[in-house]
A protein has these predicted regions:
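Active-site capping/gating regions of soluble enzymes
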Residues: 20-21, 57-131
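Catalytic activation segment of kinase domains across protein kinase-like and atypical kinase folds
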Residues: 10-68
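Weak global preference for isoleucine
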Residues: 10-12, 42, 49, 82-89, ...
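Long, compositionally biased intrinsically disordered regions
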Residues: 98-173
């Protein structure tokens, strides 16, 4: 998913309940997304696809600015999926959440080497908070995710970032 995001500007709304996880020796080996709620294209990447399929922007509401898509992908793939898998595995006692978070942080640092301009990865590693969808707040604001414009369909809140590291701890070599 990180390759698709950085190469083609595609982000998927992967939800934890739509993930199939293959375990080997009690640890994740392979992750499959059996379904997703939707997808986004980063506007700056979408020129060619929009020429072929202009309805992606007007009808599917699938194209958005980079900051918007960063926020959604950060929430759906990392906050809603990966961090919840880390929580579930950590609860087994085989390994701690902190150890798993360190593995994820290491992976993101490697990805930052590959994609040094990635605002997505920079946000995951350096921001003090991460976006999370406030389902109750969304309902209290009487928003309907199925019919509201994509940029206003949900209420997002900021919660502490468990992946945060200091920028001085990262080598860009």
């Amino acid at each position: 998913l990180m390759y698709l995001y950085h190469r083609f500007g595609m982000a998927f709304e992967s939800h934890q309940q739509n993930v199939l996880l293959e375990l080997e020796n009690h640890f994740p080996k392979t992750l499959w997304l059996r379904d997703n709620q939707g997808f986004y294209y980063i506007e700056e990447f979408a020129t060619e696809i929009l020429q072929a399929l202009p309805e992606l922007k007007e009808k599917a509401f699938a194209v958005g600015p980079k900051a918007f898509v960063d926020e959604r992908f950060s929430y759906y793939f990392f906050g809603n999926t990966i961090l919840k898998i880390i929580n579930a595995i950590g609860a087994t006692g085989y390994i701690t959440e902190d150890e798993l978070l360190a593995h994820l942080t290491g992976f993101l640092e490697e990805q930052l080497q590959q994609y040094p301009e990635s605002t997505l990865i920079q946000g995951l590693l350096f921001n003090s908070t991460l976006p999370y969808k406030g389902n109750l707040l969304t309902r209290l604001h009487e928003l309907d995710e199925l019919i509201a414009p994509v940029e206003n369909q949900s209420v997002y809140v900021q919660l502490p970032n468990p992946l945060r590291i200091s920028q001085k701890d990262v080598s860009y070599a």
